[in-house]
């Protein structure tokens, strides 16, 4: 998947931008608050229907405008797709090839994003890492998103019955069965994904780093599982045993104490827990490798590459790692869009480079 051209209109400080990107690495540079990140945000908004910076959609519309529009034409599995999103007084409308569509459409734009907030993947709370896994699985499978949504609804009902102390009711028994079934299905999807991600990370880390180190990830369940090869039936049995043993604790605390909503992903750098020992620079480097592993995992499962957005990824990286990353991106088969404040000290090659100033795209200065 590669974007052939896109147009952004009345999105934050971007009054009107039209751009035909390179199929490889595209770099937007310039001073802060000029609109670099807004370009990436607009593409992300087109792909997901959400902003990665704000929950208030009204703030996305340019000052003195009543609506915004983002359009893109891209190739997808040997076909040309046109997609657009408009948002204004009449609400939000997403279209694929000029027809109204939903965000689970198979031809939607697929995006992997690196933003400064992703540094919390290493040292942040477990929900950040769960979101990392769920977002990738959602990009890969609409079925996973459907199951995740159902799980959250069932979890809410289960917690409500625990609060009402109705654990002996028939309703609780039925909800318990559904809860365990959905939980096991989500877990097997996450575990399978972790295996593919870990393989990708093992391959990517030495290409970005020359420190001889090793990066790996492991899935941390919120309940014990019988030893041996894990499959769906084993997960269901283990979950059932644990639910039965935890019932009294759950009654006292009036909430569900196990399940995929409480799991974690552990990250190890040179056999040590990264969240405890990794420096700020190492954390950024780890997240970059995780994001590249996302792309390779997506490609392995879906058969095509998503678009890679990198916001201020070069900040806090030394010159050697920055140049190595830029070279890797320039030579990669996927399309990437990167923002940076300055480029003078970097050996940028095979990239389309534009200065962003006052919400406008200018040629390289």
Swiss-Prot record:
One GO CC annotation: cytoplasm
GO BP field: DNA replication; DNA synthesis involved in DNA repair; double-strand break repair; SOS response
Alphabetical UniProt keywords: ATP-binding, Cytoplasm, DNA damage, DNA repair, DNA replication, DNA-binding, Nucleotide-binding, SOS response
Pfam families, alphabetized: SMC_N
Domain of life assignment: Bacteria
HAMAP family: RecF (MF_00365)
Name of protein: DNA replication and repair protein RecF
Taxonomic lineage of the native organism: Bacteria, Bacillati, Bacillota, Clostridia, Eubacteriales
Locations listed in the record: Cytoplasm
Molecular functions (GO terms): ATP binding; single-stranded DNA binding
NCBIfam families xref list: recf (TIGR00611)
Keyword Lipid metabolism: no
Similarity annotation: Belongs to the RecF family.
Biological role: The RecF protein is involved in DNA metabolism; it is required for DNA replication and normal SOS inducibility. RecF binds preferentially to single-stranded, linear DNA. It also seems to bind ATP.
Residues annotated for ATP binding in this entry: 30-37
